[in-house]
């Protein structure tokens, strides 16, 4: 038995970069399973908390985020163990790795350029 669970998000995203690896924008669409009912902080996790953290450590002139929350027959979501930070960090770091591969650049070089 539990009173809340961690986040269940599906995130679709796009990162825009110049050919030299400079990040120019990020678009994130979040589909969030909110559980059977909302706790007091649950709506903030995929919206205010998560989306504001998507720049990570990088200079990023434009971030656009859209969130859709869905009530389901699962345990309600609540904030614990990072509350949006793990999702945001994984997403932006994975996008940087993919961008480096597509631009045939060293991922560390892209990270340094945008730090």
For each feature predicted by the language model, list its residue ranges.
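Short glycine-biased active-site loop of nucleotidyltransferases that positions the nucleotide triphosphate
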Residues: 3-7
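Glycine-rich loop/linker segments at domain edges
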Residues: 8-95
């Amino acid at each position: 038995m539990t009173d809340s669970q961690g986040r269940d998000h599906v995130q679709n995203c796009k990162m825009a970069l110049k050919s030299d690896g400079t990040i120019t924008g990020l678009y994130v669409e979040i589909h969030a399973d909110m559980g059977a009912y909302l706790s007091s902080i649950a709506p903030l996790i995929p919206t205010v908390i998560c989306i504001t953290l998507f720049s990570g450590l990088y200079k990023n002139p434009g971030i656009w985020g859209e969130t859709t929350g869905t009530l389901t027959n699962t345990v309600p979501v609540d904030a614990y163990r990072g509350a949006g930070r793990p999702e945001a960090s994984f997403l932006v770091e994975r996008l940087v790795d993919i961008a480096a591969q597509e631009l045939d650049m060293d991922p560390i070089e892209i990270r340094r350029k945008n730090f």
